[in-house]
């Protein structure tokens, strides 16, 4: 095999230490090895960096072990080319295995160019990514608390969620506050009616019936107050994170331009655009083409075939944060009547492939468009958009023409009898 890196280093990273092996190819067939162990404290990592520079080693490869690779990467990235590899691509043969042999194995694979590097964006994108991912977790946590709150109402024989559309709306919140303050199980109908806003006045009797005879103990009241306080706290945290994200976006002209560009796509709003930018960045040169980006995002079918038998070809589990954002945009895009491009595509796909596959296909179309837009700087304007915006009379004319052509083909093949000539 051809040697790609004459001098490189393989690193096996752990929580408290790392083992590094420098691999040098000096002209012979067998390379030479230098091995050393360092602590993961900052001073020791800087010593490791200096050791690499002293040995004229500017290419390092290590596997992405948890978050342990991040401190090492942060201190090396300014002067050294660091490649982070998925552990499945650098896995050593089981059996004769230890930390030193692992680092040597990683170095040998990297030296021959057999290691696929993971996409690590620049520092400002990584900072934005930390905020958007934390916001995603906060929203998920708040959703869990909302479910607990609704379950508590069900346990207390309160069926308010069967009447109102939003159990956390103003009317519902006022009614639940009133119930939490009561000492018994009886309610004042006039008091309940006074807390119902105009939009809900038509359902006044149903609202009163839904809370009549509720059973709420002191322990359940205490638990509901805790859950609500936690929801309010999480909401405040989300607002703070949103402010920080907006500050980062507004302070970087490339981010702001990219967000404005992505917002021209049907179904993509500002929050979704920011999430997408935080995951893939604005520089598309890291991906050779749009197919590689879609594969990295987990939106392409798998390839698992052996002996002429095809096994599971489901999409991969990649894109844990990016894929949900794109699927959310796809759901919004296929419901848009103002820009029906993806809606028409979806309606065509769903007949043949089903709803789930059709949504994933639309999400991939959106990501492909994003790749082209960020690469060229052009706004969303697909080349086949004219096919979607055809006037209705022209569509009917094309349908009639297609039916006529199909009929002529069937007649030539003898499947249909020829038309009888008109009587003169």
PLM region spans:
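A detector of single, family-specific signature residues
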Residues: 1-424
């Amino acid at each position: 095999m051809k040697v790609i890196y004459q001098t490189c280093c393989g690193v096996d990273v752990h929580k408290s230490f790392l083992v590094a092996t420098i691999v040098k190819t000096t002209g012979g067939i067998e390379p030479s090895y230098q091995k050393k162990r360092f602590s993961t404290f900052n001073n020791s990592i800087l010593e490791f960096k200096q050791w690499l520079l002293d040995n004229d080693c500017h290419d390092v490869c290590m596997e992405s072990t948890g978050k342990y690779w991040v401190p090492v990467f942060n201190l090396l990235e300014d002067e050294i080319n660091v490649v982070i590899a998925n552990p499945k691509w650098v896995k050593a043969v089981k059996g004769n295995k230890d930390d030193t042999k692992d680092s040597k194995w990683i170095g040998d694979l990297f030296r021959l160019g057999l290691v696929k590097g993971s996409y690590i964006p620049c520092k400002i994108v990584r900072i934005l990514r930390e905020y958007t991912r934390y916001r995603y977790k906060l929203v998920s946590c708040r959703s869990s608390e909302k479910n607990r709150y609704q379950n508590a109402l069900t346990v207390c024989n309160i069926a308010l969620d069967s009447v109102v559309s939003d159990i956390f709306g103003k009317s519902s919140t006022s009614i639940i506050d009133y119930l939490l303050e009561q000492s018994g199980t009886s309610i004042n109908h006039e008091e309940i009616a006074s807390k119902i806003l105009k939009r809900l006045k038509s359902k006044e009797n149903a609202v009163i019936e839904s809370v009549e005879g509720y059973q709420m103990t002191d322990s359940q009241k205490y638990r509901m107050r805790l859950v609500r306080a936690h929801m309010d706290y999480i909401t405040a945290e989300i607002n703070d994170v949103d402010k920080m994200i907006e500050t980062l976006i507004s302070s970087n002209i490339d981010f702001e331009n990219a967000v404005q560009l992505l917002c021209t796509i049907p179904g993509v709003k500002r929050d979704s655009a920011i999430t997408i930018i935080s995951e893939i960045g604005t520089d598309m040169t890291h991906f050779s083409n749009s197919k590689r980006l879609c594969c990295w995002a987990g939106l392409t079918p798998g390839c698992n075939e052996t002996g002429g038998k095809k096994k599971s070809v489901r999409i991969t589990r990649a894109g844990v944060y990016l894929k949900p954002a794109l699927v959310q945009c796809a759901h919004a895009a296929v419901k848009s009547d103002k820009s029906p491009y993806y809606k028409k595509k979806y309606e065509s796909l769903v007949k043949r492939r089903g709803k789930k596959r059709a949504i994933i296909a639309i999400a991939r179309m959106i990501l492909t468009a994003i790749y082209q837009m960020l690469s060229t700087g052009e706004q969303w304007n697909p080349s086949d958009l004219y096919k979607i915006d055809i006037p209705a009379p022209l569509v009917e004319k094309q349908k009639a023409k297609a039916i006529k052509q199909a009929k002529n083909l069937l007649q030539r093949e003898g499947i249909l009898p020829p038309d009888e000539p008109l009587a003169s």
